[in-house]
Amino acid sequence: MNNNFWKGKRVLITGDTGFKGAWLSLILGMHGAKVQGISSSKFSGNNELYSLLSVNKISNTVDCDVRDFDGVLSAFNSFNPEVVFHLAAQPLVRQSYQDPVTTYEVNVMGTMSILEAVRQSPSVQSAVIVTTDKCYKNNEWEWGYRENDPMGGHDPYSSSKACAELLTQSYQQSFFNDCSNSTGVSTVRAGNVIGGGDFSEDRLIPDLYRAISTNNKLLLRSPLATRPWQHVFEPISGYLKVAEGLFESGAKANDCWNFGPNNSDIRTVQEITELFLACWGIKDIIDFDTSTQPHEAKSLSLDISKAQFKLYWSPQWDLENAMEKTAIWYKACFEDGDILKISTEQIEEYY
């Protein structure tokens, strides 16, 4: 991260009340950026971190559904952002089975609204569209997916994010294609993120935290499934590098990027569970859920060599260190500690 680059930059973040969005807002605010958010109060189920980090003191958050193009464009026109990060999404696989229509509307047409607002906003020089590692056609193999592998998606969430990738690619080729004059636009695909402040349903670490704090057992599903686990600061640092490059080079830098851990940190759900519980010194709070579940990929990993070679980006914290930082944060939350102080200290250590 080029700390000096962000001083005074006008940065618009969609989904700033969510997990990554709140962290990104605090990081940018600490580095002197002028931040505005777009988030909808209709989807306010996971905005605890936004409050705990006092993001409202950093960002003027506009209550707007990203599917509302007129509202989105109005927010762009009033703020005149120079850099845009699009994180707003319906982010859960299992919820996408329950409500596929909203999932596709938010993740595809919401992305369309942001891309079109970027196209119509002369102030924007750099836009980063956040999708997911699940956008790839999953072959359930041991190799990491590369950026040029086919898009796919078995479940509605994964499919909707693959659609967002194809939509962005179309905009890159149709509208952001003048290397001397066009806005720079790229997509970024990250693995499973951990870190303090995620309180979403149906995510492993938040579910473990709730089980610990309520003294209940957690039913663990798919314990042998592997995922590319990484601390939330890792992909955010990649997003920032991409945004800086787009700002400097415009459409010449248009691309797509994977951000994930080193291969040694691609672990099973059970291994991650045991590591988190070890950080707490707790045992015997999990059982195994043997009931039939909606389809979720059993094996998933990313090839990050492109970001390593072209962006000089690499993960800074191994999984053990990342999990220790995560546990420290949740312990502080459990004990009513000074969350903002711990959060800023962790940011300062990483960045």
Model segments located where?
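C-terminal amphipathic/interface module of NAD(P)-dependent oxidoreductases
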Residues: 4-5, 303-351
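Generic structural signal for alpha-helix termini and adjacent loop/cap motifs
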Residues: 99, 117, 121, 174, ...
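Generic structural signal for small/hydrophobic residues in well-ordered secondary structure
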Residues: 6, 16-18, 84, 171, ...
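Conserved C-terminal active-site "lid" loop/helix of NAD(P)H-dependent oxidoreductases
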Residues: 232, 255-256, 292-314, 335
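Residues in well-ordered alpha-helical elements
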Residues: 69-70, 82, 94, 101, ...
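NAD(P)-dependent short-chain dehydrogenase/reductase
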Residues: 139-144, 148, 156, 165-250, ...
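C-terminal "lid/loop" region of Rossmann-like NAD(P)-dependent oxidoreductases
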Residues: 254-257, 267-273, 281-299, 340-346
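N-terminal Rossmann-like NAD(P)+-binding domain of SDR-like oxidoreductases, especially those catalyzing
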Residues: 1-190, 333, 349-351
